[in-house]
């Protein structure tokens, strides 16, 4: 498994030179994260015009696609495909739109923000139409009520897209948090504790600190971790609070 910085596109490329068990892949990925400061420094020394922010955003986008298989002990291609609208959400949140695939993992999303927003809007519209089928009486009260319903729904969708699709900020602490995540992933791999509820909660906190609330939700779903019942521990109630972070991280 090779990690390359693409000079022309300023992005991270992950190349698999031979078959690896999912846990081996995550162990190597953890090594990259653990040494991300040195990796970035080496890139700058070789090419001082390299866009590190683009590189980091490409890394943030690709992480959940490569991590999920380890927790399910199965190659990524055997895990259910990620919905296009979720990829569009995550692309807008990370500020990165991959134009190609990485191995057998399809990372492609439309290049323009407008195209990605339209994917999300179509998803909302489809969900709305399904709900109308269940509650058809909403259509027959009055024209005024239906127009108000559509207007309210449209404003709500635009608000959700605007606030939930804001780009994750990159700051001086981003490299540190990525390194912390790498160190923690190595602990999970070495101990083979991928279904330990306390460690999953700590993993969630690490990811939350990197991606923020909306980005974390997309990350967790893309990695296909949102169905783990063991994540719902007593500590999870305090999951996003400073109390939990202080106690367990």
From Swiss-Prot:
Top-level taxon of origin: Viruses
GO biological process: symbiont-mediated suppression of host innate immune response; viral process
Swiss-Prot/TrEMBL keywords: Host-virus interaction, Inhibition of host innate immune response by virus, Suppressor of RNA silencing, Viral immunoevasion
Coiled coil feature spans: none
Ranges of residues in domain F-box-like: 63-67
Family of the protein in this entry: Belongs to the polerovirus P0 protein family.
SUBUNIT field: Interacts (via F-box-like domain) with host AGO1; this interaction targets AGO1 for degradation, and thereby suppresses the silencing function of the latter. Interacts (via F-box-like domain) with host ASK1 and ASK2 (SKP proteins); these interactions are essential for viral pathogenicity. Part of a SCF P0 complex composed of P0 and the host proteins SKP and CUL1.
Role description: Suppressor of RNA-mediated gene silencing, also known as post-transcriptional gene silencing (PTGS), a mechanism of plant viral defense that limits the accumulation of viral RNAs. The P0 protein suppresses local PTGS using its F-box-like domain to mediate destabilization and degradation of the AGO1 protein.
Protein known as: Suppressor of silencing P0
Phylogenetic lineage: Viruses, Riboviria, Orthornavirae, Pisuviricota, Pisoniviricetes
């Amino acid at each position: 498994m090779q990690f390359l910085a693409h000079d022309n596109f300023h992005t991270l490329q992950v190349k698999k030179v031979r078959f690896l068990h999912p846990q081996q892949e995550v162990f190597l990925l953890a090594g990259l994260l653990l040494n991300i400061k040195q990796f970035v420094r080496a890139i700058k020394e070789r090419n001082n015009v390299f866009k590190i922010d683009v590189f980091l955003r490409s890394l943030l986008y690709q992480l959940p696609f490569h991590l999920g298989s380890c927790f399910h002990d199965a190659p990524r291609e055997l895990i259910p495909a990620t919905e296009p609208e979720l990829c569009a959400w995550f692309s807008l949140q990370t500020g990165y739109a991959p134009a190609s695939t990485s191995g057998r993992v399809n990372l492609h999303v439309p290049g323009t923000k407008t195209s990605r927003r339209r994917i999300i809007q179509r998803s909302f519209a489809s969900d709305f139409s399904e709900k109308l089928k269940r509650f058809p009486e909403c259509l027959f009260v009055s024209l005024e009520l239906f127009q108000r319903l559509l207007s309210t729904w449209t404003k709500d969708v635009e608000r959700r897209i605007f606030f939930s699709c804001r780009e994750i900020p990159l700051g001086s602490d981003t490299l540190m948090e990525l390194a912390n995540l790498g160190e923690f992933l190595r602990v999970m791999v070495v101990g083979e504790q991928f279904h330990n509820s306390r460690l999953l909660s700590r993993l969630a906190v690490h990811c939350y600190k990197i991606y923020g609330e909306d980005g974390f939700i997309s990350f967790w779903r893309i990695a296909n971790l949102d169905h783990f019942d063991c994540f719902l521990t007593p500590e999870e109630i305090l999951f996003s609070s400073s109390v939990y972070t202080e106690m367990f991280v």
